[in-house]
From Swiss-Prot:
Localization, UniProt: Cytoplasm; Nucleus
Residue ranges of the motif Bipartite nuclear localization signal: 280-295
Annotated GO CC locations: cytoplasm; cytosol; nucleoplasm; nucleus; SCF ubiquitin ligase complex; Z disc
Record flagged with keyword Cytoplasm: yes
GO terms, biological process: cellular response to dexamethasone stimulus; protein ubiquitination; response to denervation involved in regulation of muscle adaptation
Subunit structure comment from the entry: Part of the SCF (SKP1-CUL1-F-box) E3 ubiquitin-protein ligase complex SCF(FBXO32) formed of CUL1, SKP1, RBX1 and FBXO32.
Annotated metabolic or biological route of this protein: Protein modification; protein ubiquitination
Chain location of the short sequence motif Nuclear localization signal per the record: 62-67
Record's protein name: F-box only protein 32
Domain F-box: residue ranges: 223-271
Length: 355
């Protein structure tokens, strides 16, 4: 590759691409890579062989880069930082804007599912994306979505916890894909239609695995939940935020069934999730003329969204507009960064990228 210097009469320089990159060929007097430039230029066969080797190296490098982003790899798209700057418009300093797919790739969701405090948050976020935001993700973000979902399913199969939660997530995703895949030719999903059909078959396989799961009893024989005092059992049951969990717990033993029908337990559950105004609009009386809080709860759930509470959430710094997990350090110039942080619910996270 000739290069003309400042003097147009100079012969210029000769470069060749090697495994270590582009190198310049000089003569013997400069003690360089090749002894004689003129002798090198006369070796036409050597030039052809070197060009062939450089092309092979270039193709191999591109292939390795492509394999890293291939859908067959199960590793999440990796970014060194655990935070992302959220900008919604172009400025002189920054061009473009941050998208939902970019934030989904760069925030550490793959590791977050291993944390019990963040697990429910990530699952809820996956559910919201599956409902309405799947088409707004880029191709690599969609592959990342499926890879994280696979890790969630494998974790549930191993831990045998949150089975119903993941069943609902898979059913929501499958229903959305059925609607999107039917729109053939409208390019609503990134990638070949056959690839998405294969992913739908994978979802059905995961659902079958969850349906066939058998809960194994612990090997040790020690103190169980039913061995605790009744007041302590009731206190623990009051920590459950889902009425379906109370119903399932009541099916374990007759004594637990009596506790699960406690009116005060269901009253506190209704007051936790819903406002007084919402409760007054859905009053249900029992045969004895008393409020049936259990029936009221399930009716309220069908009419209003339940209160969401998570052990750990994503937070947005109002000073520097950086999005990160709570407790993650980010470069902030505020005097008190903690006072500038606002916790985001999964829906708030989705709304943050609606332009």
């Amino acid at each position: 590759m000739p290069f003309l210097g400042q003097d147009w009469r100079s012969p210029g320089q000769s470069w060749v691409k090697t495994a270590d990159g582009w190198k310049r060929f000089l003569d013997e007097k400069s003690g360089s890579f090749v002894s004689d430039l003129s002798s090198y230029c006369n070796k036409e066969v050597y030039n052809k062989e070197n060009l062939f080797n450089s092309l092979n190296y270039d193709v191999a490098a591109k292939k390795r880069k492509k394999d890293m982003l291939n859908s067959k790899t199960k590793t999440q798209y990796f970014h060194q930082e655990k935070w992302i700057y959220v900008h919604k418009g172009s400025t002189k300093e920054r061009h473009g804007y941050c998208t939902l797919g970019e934030a989904f790739n760069r925030l550490d969701f793959s590791t977050a599912i291993l944390d019990s405090r963040r697990f429910n948050y990530v699952v809820r976020l996956l559910e919201l994306i599956a409902k309405s935001q799947l088409t707004s993700l880029s191709g690599i973000a969609q592959k990342n979505f499926m890879n994280i979902l696979e890790k969630v399913v494998l974790k549930v199969l191993e831990d045998q916890q949150n089975i119903r939660l993941i069943r609902e997530l898979l059913q929501t995703l499958y229903t959305s894909l059925c609607t999107l895949v039917q729109r053939v030719g409208k390019s609503v999903l990134v990638g070949n239609i056959n690839m998405w059909v294969y992913r739908m078959e994978t979802i059905l396989h995961w659902q079958q695995q969850l349906n066939n799961i058998q809960i194994t009893r612990p090997a040790f024989k020690g103190l169980t939940f039913t061995d605790l005092p009744l007041c302590l059992q009731l206190n623990i049951m009051q920590r459950l935020s889902d009425g379906r969990d109370l119903v399932s717990l009541g099916q374990v033993a007759p004594d637990l069934h009596v506790l699960s029908e406690d009116r005060l337990l269901w009253k506190k559950l209704c007051q936790y999730h819903f406002s007084e105004r919402q409760i007054r609009k859905r009053l249900i009386l029992s045969d004895k003329g008393q409020l049936d809080w259990k029936k009221m709860y399930f009716k309220l759930v069908r009419c209003y969204p339940r209160k969401e509470q998570y052990g750990d959430t994503l937070q947005l710094c109002r000073h520097c507009h950086i999005l990160s997990w709570k407790g993650t350090d980010h470069p902030c110039t505020a005097n008190n960064p903690e006072s500038c942080s606002v916790s985001l619910s999964p829906q708030d996270f989705i709304n943050l990228f609606k332009f």
